[in-house]
């Protein structure tokens, strides 16, 4: 009986945890590589302006200048999150200069040109030579996750 209750409890906890992961929508990779089909720089792949969930679609939830989930809205409150190839959080893909996690905040951890975690630091996270850097034209880039 104890084993059954323990198994059911573990199952419920794991399903709740996996259910939280299912809420994140994969929006591709922030990358300068135009040949990678998952790159936002590929106009025929994830970066297509006609794709409903593309950050390059000005009428979609992630590309509209009016959506709170948008990368182009300077007042966005729920912009997509960035993760590198090791799963480390790299800030929010947002033009909001006031959001502390935004890559557009020049004084924040993820937007400062002096922070090692910033995409704007050419010697840190934004190095054009790192294989997973978004600024490497032949690299993989960082994963973009939106919320449903």
PLM segments and residue spans:
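C-terminal segment of classical bacterial N-terminal signal peptides
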Residues: 14-21
């Amino acid at each position: 009986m104890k084993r059954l209750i323990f198994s059911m409890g573990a199952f419920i906890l794991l399903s709740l945890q996996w259910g939280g992961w299912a809420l994140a929508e994969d929006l591709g990779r922030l990358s300068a590589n135009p040949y990678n089909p998952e790159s936002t720089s590929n106009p025929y792949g994830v970066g297509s302006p006609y794709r409903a969930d593309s950050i390059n679609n000005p009428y979609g939830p992630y590309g509209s200048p009016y959506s709170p989930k948008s990368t182009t809205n300077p007042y966005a409150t729920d912009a997509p999150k960035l993760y590198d190839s090791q799963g480390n959080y790299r800030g929010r893909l947002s033009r909001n200069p006031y959001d502390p996690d935004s890559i557009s905040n020049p004084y924040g951890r993820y937007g400062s040109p002096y922070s090692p975690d910033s995409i704007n630091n050419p010697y840190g996270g934004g190095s054009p030579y790192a294989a997973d850097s978004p600024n490497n034209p032949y690299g993989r880039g960082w994963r973009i996750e939106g919320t449903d």
